[in-house]
Structure formats: structure tokens, C-alpha cells
Amino acid sequence: MTWPFENDTSAITKKLAKRNLKADKSRNILIIITIALATCLIMTTTLYFFASQRKSLNDAAGRYQAIINEVDNDTITKLVNDSRVQVGVSHLLGLVSYGDYKLTVRSMDETLMKLAKYPDLEGELPKSTNEIAITKAFLDRAGLSKSVGDIISLNLGDGEKDYTLCGILPVENSNYSVFVSQSYIENKISEPAYSAYIRLNESDGWSKAAIQAELSTLCRELKIQPEQMQFSTYYFSLIEQRSSQYITVIAFISLIIALACTLVIYSLFYVS
């Protein structure tokens, strides 16, 4: 009942109530959106870091772990026959000038192709002294339109000669290399020294310390000097990206997101 001298405020009260309900509803929707976005950000960050770790481990799988330099034929034979390791062999013959850049001349075997994770070779590696394989980067830089089986004239340090192009390695990024056969190396050098690219068998999941200790033991057994062996910094940088490091980063980022989310919700409750 409303007395004659009283104002009827029921309509205003209803309007205020409706406005408050609408404001509460909007605020609740904003809170839900804020929490959902924060959850999505945390999940996206987590998935990104774990995907990065998986990519690194996949990239490391099968790669060579160390290089042993200045190795003679006898030691190469011992390494190749050792069941503990995979061994890729290469000999760097030298660098030759081609125009305004240098061309690397070296040998390489099939095992090294796998351990270095080179892309699939178009054709095959050279077997005879008159066969060579070349990187695509060199052909592109030199402006040579050549295919496997073509004859190519090059000066590899002993005058310009014709060679059969037996393989093209599809790598770019200024990798100007020519690969010659083992017989070519032996014709040029009586006692060539090789580089052995080695990897321990079944070592996926091993720690850096365990791998390096085992490889050092192998070298001692074969009387290889410590200074001859060089560990692959690229390989070990890949496997050292452990889950604990990622979890720490994820936890830190999640904390920042959670704090930001809390501030947004606080402002919605107390500022609006």
C-alpha cells in the first residue's frame, strides 16, 4: 500500500534489479571468457613446448655424436668392425676455387649420409675415379643445368677434366661441395687420413655424460688420442633440451597467465 504522501519507487527498484541482473550476467560471461582464454593459453604453451622437445629429440635420433679426426685405414677398419658403433667415413681433399667462391672436395660413404641426415641423394655416390656427386647449391650458383648421367668439366686441383655426374645432393644454403670416390682419394694420396663420424648403437635416451664416457672409453681401447675426438655440439644441444627445463618454463608462463587472469576477475568484481 502506498500512502498519498509517499512516492511509488517499485518501478525504479525493478529497473535497478534488472540492470544489476544484466550486469551480473555480463560479468559472469566475461569471467568465463577470461578463464577459458587463460586455459587455452596455458594449454597452447604446454603443447608448443612439448612439440618443440619432441622435434628436437626426433632430429637428434640417428645423428652422429662425435668426429674422430686424422684416422688411418687400420683404425677405420677397427671402428667399422666394432659392434658398439655406427661409423661414417670421409676424407677432406681440400678446397678449390670456382669463380668467386670455394668448392669443397671430399669423399663420403652411405653411412655418413645417414648419420649426417642428408636428404636423399638423386642418383648414387661415386665409385670410380671419373665419377663425382655434386650439391644442388653448387649447380645453382654456377648456373649449370646438369642431370644425373651428364658429363661435367671441373678442375678439382689437378687441371680441368671431364667427370660423369653420378649424383646430386639436394642441399642448398651455400653448401658448395663435390664428392669423389674412395679410389680417387687413394690415387691422390698414398696414406690418406680420414674423419670418422661415430654414433653409439642403441643410445637413444642416454644422457650426455653417459654417451661421452662410452665414446671416450672406445677411443682409449683403440689408442685414439683424446684430442682427435670432437663431440658434436649440435647433437648434444638437441638432447639436452629435457622435460624438466620445459616444465619450468611452462610453470612460469602459466603463473603469469594465472596472475593476469586473477587481476581481470578482481577488476570485474570490485571495479564494475
Across the structure, where does each feature detected by a protein language model lie?
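Short, aromatic-rich amphipathic segments at membrane interfaces
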Residues: 230-247
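N-terminal Sec/SRP start-transfer signal
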Residues: 1-40
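Charged, alpha-helix-enriched surfaces in structured cytosolic catalytic cores
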Residues: 8-16, 47, 160, 210, ...
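Basic-flanked hydrophobic alpha-helices used for secretion and membrane insertion
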Residues: 50-234
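Juxtamembrane/interface segments of multi-pass membrane proteins
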Residues: 4-7, 45, 236
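Hydrophobic alpha-helical transmembrane segments of multi-pass inner-membrane transport and secretion
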Residues: 25-53, 243-272
